[in-house]
Curated annotation (Swiss-Prot):
The keyword Ribosomal protein applies. Keywords: Ribonucleoprotein, Ribosomal protein, RNA-binding, rRNA-binding, tRNA-binding. Gene3D superfamilies: Ribosomal protein L10e/L16. One of its GO terms (biological process) is translation. Binds 23S rRNA and is also seen to make contacts with the A and possibly P site tRNAs. It comes from Streptococcus sanguinis (strain SK36). InterPro entries: Ribosomal_uL16, Ribosomal_uL16_bact-type, Ribosomal_uL16_CS, Ribosomal_uL16_dom, Ribosomal_uL16_sf. One of its GO terms (molecular function) is structural constituent of ribosome. The keyword Chloroplast does not apply. This is Large ribosomal subunit protein uL16.
């Protein structure tokens, strides 16, 4: 699973996800991509589940690029603990994804296979997604 090797601060602020993604809105490496149409946090487990769903459908053919990385930690207090007495312990890692960001890219397979593989991956994610193609240069 994807986790940072080391971080400066273990506990981060939640932050706000306003507007669209600044970069990474076009398909850069592959031929086809999966673009987010809503903003959300995506956990490292969701990214891994989407990757497995894609590679299983493509039967190890083609190449997959994961263009998001879970660099932000999120915390949670234990169940049954009252409010107060500090921030909770780090629970996991998330990648904040804004709308318009291309999260996954695929190359080396036909469009039908890529479309279905990315559709299966989108079912594992908490964001609404759309299939995008690389623009002709």
């Amino acid at each position: 699973m994807l986790v940072p090797k080391r971080v400066k601060h273990r506990r981060e602020f939640r932050g706000k996800m306003r507007g669209e993604a600044k970069g990474g809105k076009e398909v850069a490496f592959g031929e086809y991509g999966l673009q987010a149409t809503t903003s959300h946090w995506i956990t490292n487990r969701q990214i891994e589940a989407a990757r497995i769903a894609m590679t299983r459908y493509m039967k190890r053919g083609g190449k997959v690029w994961i263009k998001i990385f879970p660099h932000k930690s999120y915390t949670a207090k234990a169940i049954g603990v009252r409010m107060g007495s500090g921030k909770g312990a780090p629970e996991g890692w998330v990648a904040p994804v804004k709308r318009g960001k291309v999260m996954f890219e695929v190359a080396g397979v036909s469009e039908e296979i890529a479309r279905e593989a990315l559709r299966l991956a989108s079912h594992k994610l908490p964001v609404k997604c759309k299939f995008v193609k690389r623009e002709a240069e």
